[in-house]
Amino acid sequence: MSSSFGTLYKVSTYGESHCKGVGVVIDGCPPGLELSEADIQRQLDRRRPGQNVLTTDRKEADQVMILSGTENGKTLGTPIALHVNNRDQRPGDYGDISDLPRPSHADFTYQMKYGIRASSGGGRASARETIGTVAAGAVAMKVLKKKYGIEIVAWVESVGPIQASGINPDTISREEVDKQISRCPDQITAAEMEKFITELKERGDSTGGIVTCCIRNSPVGLGEPIYEKLEAKLAQAMLAIPASKGFEIGSGFAGSRQLGSEHNDLFIWKDNRLGTSTNNSGGIQGGISNGEPILFRVAFKPTATISLPQETATFTGKTETMQAKGRHDPCVVSRAIPIVESMAALVLLDMAMRQESRKSFF
C-alpha cells in the first residue's frame, strides 16, 4: 500500500476511520518556519465533520497535536509528526454488514487485494485519512505564502444539477467561500444547493458535485516534464482524494470543442512581464507553470453510504438487502474544499523545492 506523497516535501499519512487516531509525518519542511498548532487547526476545522446541517452527524473536534519537528515555535528541519485522535468512533454501526461489500465502496476491492480489511467504516479508504494531508497541506501553504505569496482558494461550483455562475477566480477569497455553509460563494445558488442537499439528507440519499480551485501568484517554471508535468501531479493528487472521479484544468474538456484560433493564449506584456491575454491553458504550458493563475476542477461522486435499502450480495454470493447505519455526508463537496486546497499545496511546494534545488548548482 502506498501512503506517501512527494519527493522533497514528502508526506506519509497513517490511521483508519475507527482506530485510535490519524495523522501524518512530514519530511523536508524547511527549517526556521514559524509554526503553531493554530496554523494547522484552521484548515482542519474547515474539513471536520458535524460542522452544520449539510454534513455528517459524526462529532469530532479534530484537534491537532505537533508531536515532533518544532522547538520554540519554529521548524527544525527534522520530521514533523502531526496527530489527531479519533473520539467519536462507532464500529458497532457496521457489525451487521461486515459480510456485505457496500455498493461503490472499497470493501470488495480491499478484501480481494489484501485478503483482509478494516471491518468498520472505510478504513484507509475513509475520508478520515485526509486529515493527514490537510494538516501537511496547511504547513505547505504557510511556506508557499511566505516564499512566493502564493494563494490557494477552492469553492463549490456545482452540486448535483445546480450550477454556480459569475465567480471571479482572480479575486475570490476563502472568507467569501466560507460565508455559505455550502461553500458556494454565489449566494443565490448557495441557497438552492443547501435546500437540495437538506432534502436528500432527509430522504437518506446523496449527490455529488464539482470543486473549482485557483492557485494565484505561482512562479514560472514549476513542473518536471515529461512524466511529472505540473498538471499530471495535480491530477494525481486530486484523484487520490476519496470520492473524486474527474479532473480537468483550464478549458478542460470544453476546450476540445474550440478552434485553435479561439483556444490559443496570446502573449502580451503586462505587470512588467510576459503574460497571456487569456488563460485557457489554466496557468500551465508544456507541463510547466507560466505565471498565470492555475485553475482546475475536481468532480466528486455522490456519497456511497446512503440510508436507503439497497439490494447487494455477500462475499459468498447470497443476495441480501443492506441499509447502512453509519453516519455520512449527503454531499462531500463542501468538506472537500480544504482537502483540494491542501493537496494542491503539497504538489506546489514539492515542485517549488525541486525547482529551487537546481538554482545554485554552479
From Swiss-Prot:
GO CC annotation: cytosol
Pathway given in the UniProt record: Metabolic intermediate biosynthesis; chorismate biosynthesis; chorismate from D-erythrose 4-phosphate and phosphoenolpyruvate: step 7/7
Keyword Lyase: yes
Segments crossing the lipid bilayer: none
Residues the entry annotates as binding NADP(+): R47
Record EC number: 4.2.3.5
Primary role: This reaction introduces a second double bond into the aromatic ring system.
Family the UniProt entry places it in: Belongs to the chorismate synthase family.
Protein name per the record: Chorismate synthase
Species, as recorded: Desulfotalea psychrophila (strain LSv54 / DSM 12343)
